[in-house]
Amino acid sequence: LQTPSILKLAAMYRNGTSLQTLVDHLLYVQKIEAGMIKLRISKVDIVVLAKQITDPFHELAETEGINFTVESLNEPLLLWIDVEKISSAIRNLLSNAFKYTSPNGKVIFKMNRIEIDGYSFCSIIISDTGKGIPEELRGRIFESFITGENTPLFSNKVGIGLRIVKNTMDLHHGTVNLDSTLGKGSTFTLLIPEGNAHFCRGPV
């Protein structure tokens, strides 16, 4: 029975849960930037991991009427990473892509192995045909509080989530870059270095 009181309580619960998630993310960002978060590094086939991450999004794509394409590698690519954190970063970007893409739009996940200045990287590109990001926000998109404007295109959760993605890539000595056109979509590119020489000899 959906009485007004029950509906009000349900709304309060959702808002409270959302606020707690926001606070948890903020505290996590503060811990990362204070050097309190340590990586749990293991050698992983990123091709297998990517399939595990992207597979559930095919069902979401069907439900939302979005064309979801995955272009991966045909052979293993071993990386030294914190599986939980890298997985979370990729899911965050994919979730945002679906969130801001309308039915009949496209989301593309593409993985490659590339070389830059003699160094090998895993390149993960997540692009969409969504709303795009306003030009005035692009230069500070990875800051925690860029969305105080609360525009219809963005929310505080997205701003903090992207900050966590940026921090995760920093911890892995990688990069995350954005290319976006308002009204046409966005492309996020992750570059994760191969090998483990870039990590400190001490605990990470």
Which sequence ranges carry the predicted segments?
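Conserved catalytic submotifs in the C-terminal HATPase_c
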Residues: R40-D45, E62, N67-L77, I114
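Glycine-rich ATP-lid/hinge loop adjacent to the conserved G-boxes
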Residues: I146-N156
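Short alpha-helical segment of the dimerization/phosphotransfer core of two-component systems
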Residues: R14-L19
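Short conserved segment of the HATPase_c
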Residues: I133-F145
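Short helix-loop "hinge" at the ATP-lid/N-box region of the Bergerat-fold HATPase_c
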Residues: A97-F98
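Helix-loop junction within the histidine kinase core
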Residues: Q30-I41
